[in-house]
């Protein structure tokens, strides 16, 4: 039986992304360096705690504050849901790491793998939708017109469509996720049919293309086209005023995109390395792999800080809701 394990020496988890720098789908349960064995669960725990607190605050504000019910904020709400879902299951990663074996059943294995893949794909998919929305809004503003059909209900339908697409994309991972005994320890792994090497490479390429290359290319095309079209336009005074009013929202979306790329680009670049080289499994390579995986996890807890620092209306509504709750 062929498998790609989520276990040591790569990031030890049932739900994490495929090991960042793994150059084969085999795994061993070699002892980890002591500093790494301590640092990894601590980092995961911090990401979990900060992510749960921050995303809970975002969900609370966006769901409770009437003035926050905008199209852009609806997409941000969906990002927060994906991040919250991932941080909720991150303790299972920690348990798997500390025990060095999968302590739960096969159904939970499939579920956790699927949730992690939701985290891998959903962020950039929703950011692609948000970038398309910004493209339409900024262009329409520059031309002193409204975007036809841009309503909260339409945004809800688009969000559901994105979740549906992501579900189809992550389904193969849930299908291949199984329990397997490796060196006497039960592990949550991806069990591939023969030929093993082909399926392993296909899974990495699948994630690279659908989870990074296509959405990032789409986003780059959207913003490049937008800048070119705006450069060729002359804005009247009314359009300039509207453009200034929309500038903060656009900046927030771009900031979220930048942080997402910062967190996920190393992971996807490591896929290219894994597909094209055969790295020795040295302590340094293992440590880098854990760092890259932790960086991708960190994306789930950073967005709330962007909203707090860059969105004055978010801060204001959060304070008002906290004040009202305290007064009650």
Curated annotation (Swiss-Prot):
Going by the UniProt record, its keywords in alphabetical order are:
Cell membrane, Disulfide bond, G-protein coupled receptor, Glycoprotein, Membrane, Receptor, Transducer, Transmembrane, Transmembrane helix
* Name of the protein described by the UniProt record: Neuropeptides B/W receptor type 1
Spell out where the chain is glycosylated. Answer: 3, 13, 25
Gene name tied to this protein: NPBWR1
Topological domains, Cytoplasmic: 62-72, 133-157, 225-248, 299-328
**Phylogenetic lineage:** Eukaryota, Metazoa, Chordata, Craniata, Vertebrata
Result of mutating residue 19 to Q? In a breast cancer sample; somatic mutation
Q: Name one Pfam family in it.
A: 7tm_1
Q: Which domain of life is it from?
A: Eukaryota
């Amino acid at each position: 039986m062929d498998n790609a394990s989520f276990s040591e020496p790569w990031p030890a988890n049932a739900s994490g992304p495929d090991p960042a720098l793994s150059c084969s789908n085999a795994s061993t349960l070699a002892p980890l360096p002591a500093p790494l064995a301590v640092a990894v669960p601590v980092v995961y725990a911090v990401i979990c705690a900060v992510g749960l607190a921050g995303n809970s605050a975002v969900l609370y504000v966006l769901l409770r504050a009437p003035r926050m019910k905008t199209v852009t904020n609806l997409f941000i709400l969906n990002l927060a849901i994906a991040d919250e879902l991932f941080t909720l299951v991150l303790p299972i990663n920690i348990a798997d790491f500390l025990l060095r074996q999968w302590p739960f059943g096969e159904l939970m294995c499939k579920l956790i793998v699927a949730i992690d893949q939701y985290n891998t794909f959903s962020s950039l998919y929703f950011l692609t939708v948000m970038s398309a929305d910004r493209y339409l809004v900024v262009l329409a503003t520059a031309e002193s017109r409204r975007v036809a059909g841009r309503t909260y209900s339409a945004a809800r339908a688009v969000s559901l469509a994105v979740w549906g697409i992501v579900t189809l994309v992550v389904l193969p991972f849930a299908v291949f996720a199984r329990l397997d005994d490796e060196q006497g320890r039960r592990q949550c792994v991806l069990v591939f049919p023969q030929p093993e090497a082909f399926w392993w490479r296909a899974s990495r390429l699948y994630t690279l293309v659908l989870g990074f290359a296509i959405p990032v290319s789409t986003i780059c095309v959207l913003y490049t086209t937008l800048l070119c079209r705006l450069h060729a336009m002359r804005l009247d005074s009314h359009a300039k005023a509207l453009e200034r009013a929309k500038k903060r929202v656009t900046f927030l979306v771009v900031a979220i995109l930048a942080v997402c790329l910062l967190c996920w680009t190393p992971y996807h670049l490591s896929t290219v390395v894994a597909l094209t080289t055969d790295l020795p499994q040295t302590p340094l390579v293992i440590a880098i792999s854990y760092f890259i995986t932790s960086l991708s996890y960190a994306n789930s807890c950073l967005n709330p800080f962007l909203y707090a620092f860059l969105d004055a209306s978010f801060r204001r509504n959060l304070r008002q809701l906290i004040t009202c709750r305290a007064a009650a």
